[in-house]
Amino acid sequence: MLSRTLRWLILAMVSALPAAAQTFELGSMEPRRTLSVGVLYAHDSWDEYWEGTLKRSNGNIGTLTTQSVTMMTGYAVTDRLGLIAALPYVWTRASQGVLHEMSGFQDLAFGAKFRLLSSRPGRLGTFGASIAAVAALPTTDYTPDFYPLSIGTAGRRAAGHLALDFRSNTAWFANASASYMWCSNVRLNRSSYYTDGQMYLTNEVVMPNVVNYTLNTGVELGRLRIPVSLVQQRTLGGGDIRRQDAPFVSNRMDFVKLGGGLMYELPKNLSVSLGAARILTGRNVGQSTTFTSGLAYALHL
């Protein structure tokens, strides 16, 4: 059986790279005492980005490529409560210019989800609701002050999620979720910085919080599952990239992303996944295309 616990993280990566576990498929739970492990590879690249609302290319960057390998695990404590953890190793590279590549372990994400309710099977199908809480902590002292090559924000994050789901009596499923993510302040290795039209004589940067809205739908045909997702991210604050300047860690980063994938169950509790996603529109982000592939194994203890 394809691990439902690891579906959360697979869909999270397809929807919102490179941050682990920002969005989840919350509509199903793994049977109690099921341990899941998996690995996910992601390749994300862009050669155009939005400088505020101005879309442009940059000869000092060329094509910016971010790759990651994420180790994931999940455990179903009960039929209604599941735990997850994920740790990505990330490396970035610009094809032009003098900016050097960066690499390292990013943030350890861990959390839990709880199934609030599940309706009895009806004429159309079943309805349900779930909640989740996730936290992420940096595992290394990587710098957040080298965007767009920094591998992360180097800050602590915590998020709450709420999802409603529907599974038809045929092969169709859908769910909608919303999340709110709190972001801690981050510190730079310098005594001052300039952003959003102001000079700050401190090394501490106030980070804006983030909200995400996700729609997932698709079909499940025997061992094959085909999901499609639409994700909107809105940053609650932050300034735009200054004209002809580098991005900054606290910039407003908004986008709408369309993604899809294939998940197939193999014998012996193995499953494989392939995914792709494209940013349709954004602000202070690259118009990236993302490809993912994953392998998962589920064991009932």
Tell me what each language-model feature is:
Residues 41-47, 87-93, 116, 135-141, ...:
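Transmembrane beta-strands of outer-membrane beta-barrel pores
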